[in-house]
């Protein structure tokens, strides 16, 4: 029986989960090496492999609590420690952590930050200080995840789409990206921007505003904002995000991206 079938049957209760132990171990190993991904782009569309999430959830059930020593520091967890970061060409600055079952391509730099199980981080990406890449999040190549950013994770429900950040995006300081949000290639989020499934993203660069939910288009320059909403007790300003400009090859190569962002009043 294939590993996928063993894992799906064990999660559904049709097979004793002990029978799936070796299948779960092999699957988490493959996630760790980057041979399998919880989500991947196929013909331009992102596909979620639910059974890999089930494998992670089963690993929590099957794993035994084990003391982990790091000098004078002691931890207690069910997941073993990743032990081949130098061989994978990944730089992790103490006390940063990439959890076993997450994969970072060569050239990734992780400052004192955290990358959770099931996540995938593309080559050349920087995960800056105190940033978090949540479980199963998919981060592209040459992405900058600035200090204090929270990239949400999701394991349940298994069919839920994880947060996806495409290649060359810039996620500014203290941004929050959760609930399966999709950040398009080359997009820029200004500092403190929050992107979730329920917060509107409003493009104000055209004659008429265009609203998005949980999706930032490629090359969009986005800042945090508010918009008025009227309730029986009065008018309040609720959180939203505004697309105020667009990144282009011209800005990157000739004018300079930083200069363009300053013109727009965007802080990173």
What is the predicted role of each segment?
Residues 1-90, 219, 224-268:
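Terminal amphipathic alpha-helical/low-complexity segments used for targeting or macromolecular assembly
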Residues 90-230:
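Structural signal for interior beta-strand "rungs" in well-ordered beta-sheet cores
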